[in-house]
A protein has these predicted regions:
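ATP-binding N-lobe of GHMP and related small-molecule kinases
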Residues: 1-99, 117, 121, 126
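Catalytic-loop motifs flanking and including active-site residues across diverse enzymes
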Residues: 65, 107, 142
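Short, small-residue alpha-helix embedded
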Residues: 105-118
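Alpha/beta catalytic cores of group-transfer enzymes, especially the acyltransferase/condensing modules
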Residues: 121-147
Length: 147
């Protein structure tokens, strides 16, 4: 099975970054909303995990072999014990890189959702959320585009 989905842009309406705490991280307080625009991802069966990047902002990612989409899908393979999923992923990149719109995390979340469906994996939302959390601080909220 194959599929496609939107990876919506995350808009920070409010963001407060606190001082570094004991574990070396900054506590965050934020209020976000998700837009009706973003990147588009599609997956189809393949012989091995592969990523093709297209779109107006593809140039910044075209040579990046370890972007968040690939990291998320490799982590999914680790959790399932099957290794990297044999999927051909196309990322149609419409969000500018490093613009604070959560594009990479949204792309990773969309890839996880699509892979679960395409591979008919018996993983619940909590398991996907754990994988997304390992990708980045905004991974869980970008997974399902929910603040």
């Amino acid at each position: 099975m194959d599929g496609a989905t939107l990876a919506p842009a995350k808009v920070n309406l409010f963001l407060h970054v606190g001082p570094v705490d004991g574990d070396g991280y900054h506590p965050l307080a934020s209020l976000v909303a998700f837009a009706d625009l973003g990147d588009r991802l599609s997956v189809e069966p393949g012989e091995a995990l592969a990523l093709r990047v297209t779109g107006p902002f593809a140039a910044g990612l075209a040579d990046e072999a370890d972007n968040l989409v690939l990291r998320a899908l490799r982590a999914l393979g680790d959790v399932t014990g099957t290794g990297p999923p044999p999927l051909r992923v196309t990322l149609d990149k419409h969000l500018p890189l490093a613009a604070g719109l959560g594009g990479g995390s949204a792309d990773a979340g969309a890839a996880l959702r699509l892979a679960r469906r395409a591979l008919d994996l018996d993983l619940d939302d909590a398991a996907l959320t754990q994988i997304a959390a390992g990708i980045g601080a905004d991974g869980p909220m970008c997974l399902f585009a929910r603040p």
